[in-house]
């Protein structure tokens, strides 16, 4: 417990030094066991934490020592632990992100690092000083490692405080760069982000995930797209990619030659094999999470091949998944 307390004290100070928090704002928490937690106390300044400012919680989110008062955001922290696999939570008020949230609906990543690490970050509406309806925060954090609360701050999760800290810091710097590029007064959603439009199946129905009809539609959409074929040709996209659905043990292998899909079969012998549960494949095909980000986070698992090798075809694959996300699924 002493090590966890020291870690929390250290990360609180670093958050303050990086100006990701000021005054008495923000709160930190972590799991200390299967059903036990440690959280900063009410009005505890993160820059100057001591062991007395840290509160042990039981499985109900109640202080083990009744004379202590936990952070007012404790219900949100408990909801996040219940709904995600978070081991540590960092909730702070980064000034750049806070200002950005007032004029945007989401953060759209620009750099490759942002796309790999945080993806598109939703901005959640809120009209109370504390998070009284954590459901939307939990939903966002199931698909993204960090979420933005409008006019309030960020919530980042990770296996450690370091991971949650780095996600928060990266997001603040990314927003800073967007402000620097566009100017705070004129910053708006990137004009190059078109509204998502779904293709409608001929019979008006949605495709069953990983059905033959669904996979055929994916192939046709890619081969019929001039940009995908150009990007694939430019990067010499020649490989075989297997997509695997865990629940039904369904596998499809898509073979690419010079940027064109030349074969689709139900084998599992691709150079690369990506496997995942239906929840995460649905999230990818519904544009809730980027495929590369889902793989980076372990929601989808690269069971064959190396991500670094796969990433050399990032541009055509990104285009393919953007097309595939327009195809309606059940």
Spans of model-derived segments:
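Feature captures hydrophobic
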Residues: 193-330
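Glycine-rich flexible loops
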Residues: 1-213, 271-273, 286-289, 297-301, ...
């Amino acid at each position: 417990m002493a090590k966890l307390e020291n870690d929390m004290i250290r990360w609180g100070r670093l958050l303050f030094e990086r100006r990701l928090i000021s005054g008495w704002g923000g709160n930190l928490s972590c799991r200390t066991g299967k059903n036990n937690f440690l959280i900063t106390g009410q009005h505890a300044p993160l820059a100057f934490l001591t062991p007395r400012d840290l509160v042990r919680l039981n499985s109900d989110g109640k202080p083990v020592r009744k004379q202590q008062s936990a952070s007012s955001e404790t219900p949100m922290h408990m909801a996040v632990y219940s709904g995600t696999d978070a081991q540590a939570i960092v909730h702070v008020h980064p000034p750049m992100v806070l200002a950005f949230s007032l004029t945007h609906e989401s953060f759209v990543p620009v750099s490759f690092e942002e796309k790999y690490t945080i993806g598109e970050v939703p901005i959640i509406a809120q009209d109370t000083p504390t998070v009284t309806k954590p459901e939307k925060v939990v939903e966002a954090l199931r698909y993204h490692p960090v979420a933005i609360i409008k006019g309030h701050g960020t919530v980042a999760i990770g296996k450690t405080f370091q991971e949650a800290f780095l996600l928060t810091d990266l997001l603040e710097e990314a927003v800073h760069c967007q402000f620097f590029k566009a100017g705070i007064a004129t910053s708006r959603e990137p004009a190059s982000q078109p509204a998502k439009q779904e293709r409608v199946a001929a019979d008006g129905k949605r495709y069953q995930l990983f059905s033959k009809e669904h996979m055929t539609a994916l192939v046709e959409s890619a081969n019929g797209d001039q940009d995908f074929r150009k990007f694939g040709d430019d990067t010499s996209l020649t490989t075989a990619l297997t997509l695997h659905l865990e629940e039904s043990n369904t596998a499809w292998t898509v073979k690419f030659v010079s940027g064109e899909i030349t074969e689709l079969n139900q084998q599992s012998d691709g150079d690369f094999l990506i496997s995942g549960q239906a929840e995460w494949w649905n999230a990818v095909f519904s544009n809730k999470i980027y495929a590369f980000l889902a793989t980076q986070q372990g929601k989808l698992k690269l069971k064959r091949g190396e991500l670094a090798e796969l990433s050399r075809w990032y541009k055509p694959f990104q285009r393919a998944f953007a097309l595939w996300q327009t195809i309606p699924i059940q």
